[in-house]
Design a protein with these regions (language model features):
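Short, small-residue-biased leader/transition segments that mark boundaries at the very start
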Residues: 2-4
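A conserved, well-ordered hydrophobic junction motif at loop->secondary-structure transitions
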Residues: 25-51
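HotDog/MaoC-like acyl-thioester-processing domains
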Residues: 80-82, 93-149
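Short amphipathic beta-strand and strand-loop transition segments with alternating hydrophobic
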Residues: 15-18, 92
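Hydrophobic beta-strand-centered segment that forms part of the acyl-chain substrate-binding groove
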Residues: 53-87, 92
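Residue-level recognition of well-ordered beta-strand positions that form the cores
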Residues: 27-29, 72-74, 89-91, 105, ...
């Protein structure tokens, strides 16, 4: 089996992931139900998006599973829920044994950095991921079908 997100979850954020060199990328459409203030994407939703893309860095780049042990988030600019899309990008910054530091950024439709996160992930060995979490491998969408914006 490969990594699968549950697109049938009505409450889910429904992200899709692509590989772009060392980065994992997601292009996501804000929805009005995720606003915290009028036409403003809730900060908690932004944190969910950033945490999720960091998890996919672990899944895809390291081919294992892990859990978030710490997340530092910096909100720089509000995100408009009426925007056509936002872009999230994340990559590994550092690996210390089973601890992985991942940097992620959320950009608005004008390619301005709105939110940044540094996630610290505790990762499991591939053996444990396979035996206890039933994780075999993770594919992302091919880079050649990365949507053009």
């Amino acid at each position: 089996q490969m990594c699968i997100r549950d697109s049938n979850n009505e409450a889910g954020v429904r992200m899709e992931f692509y590989e772009d060199g060392d980065e994992i990328v997601s292009i996501w459409k804000p929805r009005p139900e995720y606003q915290g203030w009028i036409d403003t994407l809730h900060g908690g939703i932004q944190a969910v998006l950033l945490d999720e893309i960091c998890a996919w860095v672990v899944l895809r780049k390291l081919q294992t599973t892990g859990v978030t042990s710490k997340m530092e988030t910096r909100y720089r600019k509000s995100v408009d829920t009426k925007d056509s899309h936002v872009v999230l990008r994340a990559a590994i910054k550092e690996i210390k044994r089973n601890i992985v530091i991942i940097e992620a950024k959320l950009y608005n439709k004008d390619n301005e950095v709105c939110t940044e996160a540094v996630c610290t992930y505790f990762t499991f060995s591939q053996e444990k991921a396979k035996s206890e979490m039933h994780f075999l491998y993770c594919d992302v969408e091919p880079e050649e079908i990365l949507p053009l914006i």
